[in-house]
Each structure stands twice: as C-alpha cells, then as structure tokens.
Amino acid sequence: MSQYRCYMIDGRQTIVSVEILDVATDDEARHEARRLFFDRGDADGGFEVWLRDRLVERHATPLSVY
C-alpha cells in the first residue's frame, strides 16, 4: 500500500482539505479521489492526487482554471 494525498480545491484554487488515500495503485487512488470529490460539497474547484512528489491526476471543474 502507498499513501497518496488528495487535495480538495475550491473555486478560488485554495486547498480546502487533504485526504490520505491508502491504496495500492494509481488507478485506485484516482477512483477514490473522484468518489471523495463527488461526495463532498466544499471542493467545487476540483482535486489533485499526489504520490510523494509525483502528480497522479488533476481534475478541474469547468469553472476552475489551473
């Protein structure tokens, strides 16, 4: 298992929370991050998933720009 970090981001591109994802693969981390994002209401800008210093996925909602 690896510890991925999932940063939930609001519409102003501010981190509103960080979730630790204990999963085995990048695909599992992406899936869990999407589930968390759609279950939450305060992360309307998107999310980023990181494994150490490697960006695994960046998801931005249509109104947010990175």
Predicted features along the sequence, with ranges:
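Short aromatic-glycine-(Arg/Gly/Cys) micro-motifs in beta-strand/loop hairpins
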Residues: 1-16
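Generic alpha-helical hydrophobic packing signal
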Residues: 5-7, 32, 48
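Short acidic, gly/pro-rich beta-turn/loop elements at beta-sheet edges
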Residues: 16, 31, 59
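A short, charged, amphipathic alpha-helix used as a generic interaction element across diverse proteins
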Residues: 24-44
